[in-house]
Amino acid sequence: MNQPNRGQILQTVFSHFFPVASPDSELVPSSLHEDITPILRVAKDVEDTNPRSLFLQDLDIKSVDDSINILSGHSHALDKANELDPTSSGRDVRQFKNTILQWLEKNNESTLKARQKSSDAHEMQSFYQQYGDEGINDLLNAGAGSSSSQRTKIYQTAVVLYDVLDAVHRKANIKVAAKILESHAEVEAKNKIYVPYNILPLDPDSKNHAMMRDPKIVAVLKAIRYTSDLTWQIGHKINDDEDVLDWLKTMFRFQKDNVSNQREHLILLLANVQMRQTQRQPNLLDDRALDTVMEKLLGNYNKWCNHVGLESSLRFPKDKQQKVVQQRKLLYTGLYLLIWGEAANLRFMPECLCYIYHHMAFELFEMLESKGSKKKYKPKNPTYSGKDEDFLTKVVTPVYKTIAEEAKKSGEGKHSEWRNYDDLNEYFWSKQYLDKLGWPMKANADFFCKTSQQLGLNKSEKKPDLGDGCVGKVNFVEIRTFWHLFRSFDRMWSFYILSLQAMIIIAWNETSESGGAVFHKVLSVFITAAKLNLFQAFLDIALSWKARHSMSTHVRQRYIFKAVAAAVWVLLMPLTYAYSHTSIFIVAILIYLSPNMLPEMLLLIPSIRRTLEKSDFRPVKLIMWWSQPELYIGRGMHESAWSIYKYMMFWIVLLTSKLAFSYYVEQIKPLMGPTKEIMSVPMPGYWLPEFFPHVKNNRGVVITLWSPVILVYFMDTQIWYAIVSTLVGGLYGAFRHIGEIQTLGMLRSRFQSLPGAFNACLIPNENTKEKGIKLAFSRKCHKIPNTNGKEAKQFSQMWNTIINSFREEDLISNRELELLLMSCWAYPDLDFIRWPIFLLASKIPIAVDIAKKRNGKHRELKNILAEDNCMSCAVRECYASIKKLLNTLVTGNSDLMLITTVFTIIDTHIEKDTLLTELNLSVLPDLHGHFVKLTEYVLQNKDKDKIQIVNVLLKILEMVTKDILKEEIKRLHLLLTVKESAMDVPSNLEARRRLTFFSNSLFMEMPGAPKIQNMLSFSALTPYYSEDVLFSTFDLEKENDGVSILFYLQKIFPDEWKNFLERVKCGTEEELDAIDYLKEEIRLWASYRGQTLTKTVRGMMYYQKALELQAFFDLANERELMKGYKSAEASSSGSSLWAECQALADIKFTYVVACQQYSIHKRSGDQRAKDILTLMTTYPSLRVAYIDEVEQTHIYSKGTSENFYYSALVKAAPQTYSTDSSDSGHMLDQVIYQIKLPGPPIIGEGKPENQNNAIIFTRGEALQTIDMNQDYYIEEAFKMRNLLQEFLEKNGGVRYPTILGLREHIFTRSVSCLAWFMSNQEHSFVTIGQRVLANPLKVRFHYGHPDVFDRVFHLTRGGVSKASKVINLSEDIFAGFNSTLREGTVSHHEYIQVGKGRDVGLNQISMFEAKIANGSGEQTLSRDLYRLGHQFDFFRMLSCYFTTVGFYFCSMLTVLTVYVFLYGRLYLVLSGVEKELGNKPMMMEIILASQSFVQIVFLMAMPMIMEIGLERGFYDALFDFVLMQLQLASVFFTFQLGTKFHYYCKTLLHGGAEYRGTGRGFVVFHAKFAENYRFYSRSHFVKATELGILLLVYHIFGPTYIGLFTISIWFMVGTWLFAPFLFNPSGFEWHEIVEDWADWKKWIEYDNGGIGVPPEKSWESWWEKDIEHLQHSGKWGIVVEIFFALRFFIFQYGLVYQLSAFKNKYSSLWVFGASWLLILILLLTVTVLDYARRRLGTEFQLLFRIIKVSLFLAFMAIFITLMTCRLILPQDVFLCMLALIPTGWGLLLIAQSCKPLIQQPGIWSWVMTLAWVYDLVMGSLLFIPIAFMAWFPFISEFQTRMLFNQAFSRGLHISRILSGQRKHRSSKNKD
């Protein structure tokens, strides 16, 4: 066998890495990717053309192999192998080489036989010359006719082919021909020019490209390429197309791809801004556009300079030409973009970028000035300008490494022990720190904490005397404590506490004292206020203690002075209050309030306050110093006076109602009488030991009774907020015309107004649309004058585009499509729009019947037609169509003359109103029938019907047949035949919803639409990790519980499946399965109905389609518009116009998907990467950004390697040389930009880091963030340019909005009742909830997608999210916090909607709620919320609290109220106090009863009812509410209350917050019992068991009555215990129960855990993970955990005195002590048993059994003795169990908290055994009732109806699905 020639590596990749016939170029190891992949791709292109050339290209790849030295002696192969990877040490390299080699050995002979020339060298030369002749030369001859992508592809291919040719010639010692060398030199030069581009092709031959012909882009290009005044570095070769960015790259050493990326970014930014301005000089860059961009881009930098007291580095030459000044502005602007584009993770630190930019801009200024100076000296070079990539390695990398090192500490450390992004950024807010850091950055500065050697900085610098440590937290420390709630919102808590004190004083003294005395006592609230102020000052110092060394001097002084002042007032207030004259105390109060008077007075004049707060003037700062900390952010946030008045009135009404209700009805006044009576009642029958015997007036009882009342007082504001916000939101929505069109009937009634509304809203119009209150009361619409007008044509094309989109999405059938489409052809004699047939349904048959019955009564018929405009239009159109049809069908002059005469007579009678009187229309129904038959025959156009047609024509007028316009005949036929059935068109509920919402939105307030050229440009960004892209055939057919996803979707969407079959022209599923190529269509159909990336991409790419159509409307003339956009798209004559439309759309819109793992998926052959590539091929404008991890081997370091990271952007590569057009699998991507990073970019929260990586590739002035489980619609895309105009309108505010909030539609609501509950809850939040947040409250933030950001504003202020680990878990809302703190404004708009998928299973929903609760817990600790709470005015602060963490805190108080109430009652009944009090506690229960379900009903139901009522009618809202209750919605919401409570408290106490991926799948399948137990054990089951025991004890010893509040607690207990099983599909199926029991037993087995065993497999592993958070909790968290665990000992303390031996006999503490002795003996016994089991259980089983029997007998002997002596009664055994269970659990909690102290093998093993026993018993007790109910089949049927009732109403036959499961299983069992 011949030795394989050198370089043979290509096709072997394929045989091992990918099982196809040719190699996959995408599976090359990352270390070889850059060199090998281009060769493999070219090989694939030429494979079928010349197989030997393919093989020879493989030969060149073989040169990477040295470890298998087949070609020893060939020095070139060895050299190249050593150069790339001589030891094959790279990841997968050896495997790659071996596989290639195997293929080469197999295919060498076959390729030799196919060789056409005498040698490989001649073969390769022949092919190269052929390629040059046929490829390159044809390309050069084509010139402008070829696209830039084609040119790029061909030149890249030619370069690769030459490399192979050169290698083969050198191997054969043959010189390459001179002609080929000359050709190659030219190709090499061209290849450097024609590089892959993103949007703008900037190569010289692209001047005729539609985008490059735009005068604005030409002007910007001309401006940035003006470099004649710039001095280049010595040796630099200047090219004609170089620009100012190239100069900046050369001087500051930026990366090439960064420069290319920001060049396009800058060009598009400037061009888009210039498009909106009035042109002065069309071919020159307008200074106004440049100033606008520069001001917005560098606005934050200028503010920063003013704040830190630095002179701006933006300095411009005086008395210079405009070109020079403009060039300087471009340099400054470009410099910032280049810094930002290469800053990587530093983009989260905007002021750090300001610091870098400040120094680099000053160096730029010095360079430019030195060049223009008259003095002769060498121009100054930048500090970091030595080598390529110096900016990355010397500026970005040191800061990045500091971030990375700090992030490593975040793993298990406390927030206070490491610096997050905000801490590091705030370092740059202080000039003293900037001076310490210096420029160039000092390696030993306290910012870094690293040595200069580690950072690679200048080691020769002298170290300043800064100490060895690094600076810590600067302005804020996140301490994990509940006190953050008081510290952040101290004014609110002070208000509540002082109001409560005042109300109690008034109620207590209402009848006993005079008004003056009561007033004097009420004034004592200021003493309390002083104490609260001191407490707040103490909290500020305590929680900032760890930052005491690093915070600025003025901040320290402020804290100290506030504490001292507060302490002084705490002393002065009581002294002055005790003075006999009240006036002195009032004077003291006025003096006390004076420091805060100025800010509160300025609240009424917000403009002055904003000015003062934003001022950096020292005297002003001194005045504001007391009330406002000197921070860079959080200043000037106040709204306009009108906005302040609105939310002030909102809160005045709310607080007045709340306080009045609390005082008069609920809490204060009604309780005063019972409280006084309790305090006066003696307590002789006290059963328990008294710890405080000298306390008088039963104060302990009063505290016990009042504690839950106080908690309710602090909690019920949330309920009042729900009430008031619902009313305000509903009223506001009604004025905004929400829900005006609710049904198809309403749509039909107002459809004729749609063209006018469309014209007013979506067509650029000089007339200003009505807004505000004028629009709220207006129903007037613009009218379209006639059918031949441009507006009518635009509306019909837009409407038809929407309807066609419905058909493509299979929402409507072909027949519905025909009924919904509008005719695009107009009759000259008709003066109205030809409406869709569904609007005219049954009008013709009715009109015919009316005409027959009204024979002779023409005026009556005319009046009927005048009243029904649709009927009139239908009759007139039908008449015109028949006239046209007959004139077309009939030939012959005499026949035509006869027809003309007949129609002339009819027209004459119509004009004279004598049609019915002069003509007999009684035969009109027969004539109607004949025309129906005629249209049917003509439509079918069959030869056999020609005789029939002739017969019909003879009956109506002797006509002949002729083929005419089919669409017109179709429409006429539908007009004649369609009756009542079309009244329900479309039948699909989703299509109805979308049509009604779109139509309704046209009557809502929105900005006018600008022309496409004048609209703001924008991008959409979707972060994607590893979710489903496109369902595979395997996934669709794989059965889960006997049901496949495809089968499930077919039942969920039966009408859409039927429409799909109709679209692909398959009558049955069998026909569908028989056609292979339709499998891809099935995958798409299913993916469009799931939460997949494919669905999201399709929706977002509707933007492109909408913009192209709108651009066509703007650019087309009358004639082109009448032809329609489709004719322009299809015809060659319209290609130029359509190319211009596409170019405009590309300029205005960019879509980037941030696929973080794309390169990993691609190199591993993951199907998700191929599906993403398919999306890029389907949508050429789609771009994918990803993180590329490239391994590079160090040749001289014995095979060591290093990973480098890149931000990369790819698009679908052009397929120039695809030999088989049907080969859809030959798809490749093409790297556009690849920007090197300083290290792994994911060092914080993954999602925001992923967004940050991709944001540099977005374009435009706005950025829409879209999640990968969202959907979009073509009709909504038409309104995007209106929405973007909101950025240019203040809408009554003082600032332009920086975030535009949009409403969402939850499209997963139909899956199950849980999905319905969740979607209703979510829908009310994203509509009425956010409506109120935005207006009037002005506290809407960013709650995720699909909000639209002011992109330039946010990219200079930290991005669209925050990424610090854990603290920014809810990364979205922090973007809203950040925007508001930096003087941004967030608005909300409901005339546009985006689809959103939500979780559909209980476990999914609970994980989502857990994530949000965790995030809210972290928000509570955050600096953002603290600053908002302090910088907002009082009323806006209240809004901020109750709409963020306040909701979760009030949910926590709701549950705590239950605990406090029950433990209080436990104390009362066990101590005998309740018996002494009689009926007094009844009052407490009555008051608390109103709070039981109010929280759930009002917080969840009220907004839902209001919003559903607005949008669909209040009858439907009431019906839905009742139906939700029948489907146990109260159970669901009560259960979720427990989820919020558990995870919010756990996060605040111990941390442990983490991202919880909920999945995007269809979760309607059964969850195992063990899985539910693991997830809900500690969050619900344990707490429910505790409450159940409390209720049980209370009912045993308490009164016999059962109050409403007690019933509600029992309901909560039952819900928390059994809701997971009640909402679990097939939860009561017996076969599932059996399987669950087996799985539970396997999981709960003791000692089956250990290292590496996942929690899903072992109870031990799960338990260790469950208590893991305690190991990392702080000391205070452990103390609080232990303190709360002590509550379980109350059971033992109370119940031990209820034993028959001690009851009413002994009340000494020795009884309680003796009980502990018994417990310790019992625990010791358990320990002995556990020890014996471990030591003797295996080898000495007999001895172990003897020990167990002995202990058992001893226990029984003692028990029988006690029973015999009557020391223990049977009921005492039960009481002992009730006391022992909580006590043991309390000991277990304490032991778990103290694990580091007691982690001895013996002790910890005992703890584990105790925990295992509790879980075993609790799980078994839970399982018993479930198994019992599974015996009864009707329970399972009821559960199925309850879970899936909503789906039943939409045609979902869940019973068929479940029966399919059972049949499937039974068939398996039989097999």
UniProtKB/Swiss-Prot annotation:
GO biological process: (1->3)-beta-D-glucan biosynthetic process; cell wall organization; regulation of cell shape
Class of the enzyme per the UniProt entry, highest EC level: transferase
Transmembrane segments: 492-512, 522-542, 559-579, 584-604, 641-661, 702-724, 1442-1462, 1486-1506, 1517-1537, 1581-1601, 1602-1622, 1676-1696, 1709-1729, 1742-1762, 1773-1793, 1816-1836
Membrane topology, from the record: Multi-pass membrane protein
Keywords: Cell membrane, Cell shape, Cell wall biogenesis/degradation, Glycosyltransferase, Membrane, Transferase, Transmembrane, Transmembrane helix
Protein name: Callose synthase 4
Extracellular side of membrane: 513-521, 580-583, 662-701, 1463-1485, 1538-1580, 1623-1675, 1730-1741, 1794-1815
Enzyme Commission number(s): 2.4.1.34
